[in-house]
A protein has these predicted regions:
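Ligand-binding loop in jelly-roll beta-barrel domains
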Residues: 128-144
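Non-catalytic, conserved peripheral segments adjacent to functional cores
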Residues: 7-119, 138-140, 147-196
Length: 196
């Protein structure tokens, strides 16, 4: 096989896109190429992403590092400051959750749970109109994500991670959860700011 053929093979169908049970939320699974040096995969390609998911203008990449039991969320930004996110884990393992806050959606109030890890290399796309959070399942996790809107502290909001109406089955004893004081003040789902 010549170099051109090899490159065409590598760049063809290098990401699997699967829409979840909630419309607009997608799981992306890359095709990973392993050899004696390690591995290579294409983490994001604008043209392929837009062909499957649609046009999203990502403007910033963020990264966080957390230890086992850390639960961040459930976060969102209100109104025109709402954010779409493409999230992934580059070290460790997390359980990632997106909650549908779109009142007009047939899945309003429902949630999606996806395990993201350095091993499965999956990504989760969460459109605007959702609350988002994750729980660290490994001793340590490095979590990175793209966003399509600026961080706007005056417009940020959160919902309690253990809200009974949402009913997320986090695989951890509540006493082992590590969260921020701000997240402890999250609203009940019924009092959240919803999207149309």
């Amino acid at each position: 096989m010549n170099l051109l053929s090899l490159w065409q093979n590598i760049t063809k169908d290098n990401m699997e896109y699967e829409e979840t049970d909630i419309k607009g939320v997608w799981v992306l699974t890359p095709k990973v190429f392993n050899d004696n040096r390690g591995y290579f995969f294409e983490a994001w390609k604008k043209s392929d992403f837009e062909a499957h998911v649609g046009k999203v203008d990502f403007i910033q990449d963020n990264e966080s590092k957390s230890s086992y039991g850390v639960l961040r969320g459930l976060h969102y930004q209100k109104g025109t400051y709402s954010q779409a996110k493409l999230v992934r884990v580059i070290k460790g393992k997390v359980l990632d959750v997106a909650v549908d806050l779109r009142k007009s959606s047939p899945t309003f109030g429902k949630h999606v749970m996806v395990e993201l890890s350095e091993d499965n290399k999956r990504q989760l796309f969460i459109p605007r109109g959702f609350a988002h959070g994750f729980l660290v399942l490994s001793p340590e996790a490095i979590f990175t994500y793209k966003i399509d809107n600026i961080y706007a502290p005056a417009h940020e909001a959160s919902i309690r991670w253990n809200d009974p109406q949402i009913g997320i089955n986090w695989p951890i004893d509540q006493k082992d959860v590590v969260t921020s004081p701000k997240d402890l003040e999250g609203k009940d789902f019924k009092d959240a700011d919803f999207f149309e």
